[in-house]
Amino acid sequence: MNKKLFAYLLFFVVLVLGFYYFLFRGNDFWRTKLPVISYTKPFEFKTQDGLPFTDRDMLGKVTVVEYFFTNCKSICPKMNTNMKEIFAVYKDEPNFMILSHTCDPERDTVARMKVYADSLGADTRKWLFLTGRKDSLYNIARSAYLLDDPKNSLDKIEDQFIHTQFFA
């Protein structure tokens, strides 16, 4: 009886140790891996402070992206309220940032983006408001962030307007 008890104990000790090994140090074969859907293309925009911001500034960071415009009266205020909640949860994460791109760069100048960021009380070290050339902003929205179907692109950039309720 002693040998049988010892064998059972040994079996369960090995089983528990094996379980903990695979749980904490072993392969992550059981973890779900997210597929890469798109890569960010090279770009350069201006922040609310007039500083350049490029795709290289996003390297190694988890980034939440949105498109909005400062004089929007429909979905944008609600989106930015939701974005404030996201920011509150992740603001202390060292590799987290939010990028709010304008979809109306003719009106949303650097100065206007600064006023808007200040009105939200945004911490602009980790939540940046970006403006730039309309064709560049829209190209990145479609090709990198997948916020709009590239088939929606019209011949004239002046006739285009991306206004979406989605975050990327």
Residue ranges with predicted function:
Residues 1-46:
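N-terminal targeting signals for export/organelle localization
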Residues 34-35, 54-56, 119-121, 158-159:
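Short secondary-structure boundary/capping segments
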Residues 40-41, 63, 164-165:
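Short loop/turn microsegments at loop-to-beta-strand junctions
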Residues 46-47, 168:
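Hydrophobic alpha-helical segments, especially N-terminal targeting/anchoring helices
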Residues 53-83, 99:
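Short active-site neighborhood of thiol/selenol oxidoreductases, capturing the structured segment around
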Residues 80-140:
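Structural microenvironment flanking redox-active thiols in thiol-disulfide oxidoreductases
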Residues 134-168:
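Thiol/disulfide oxidoreductase modules built on the thioredoxin-like
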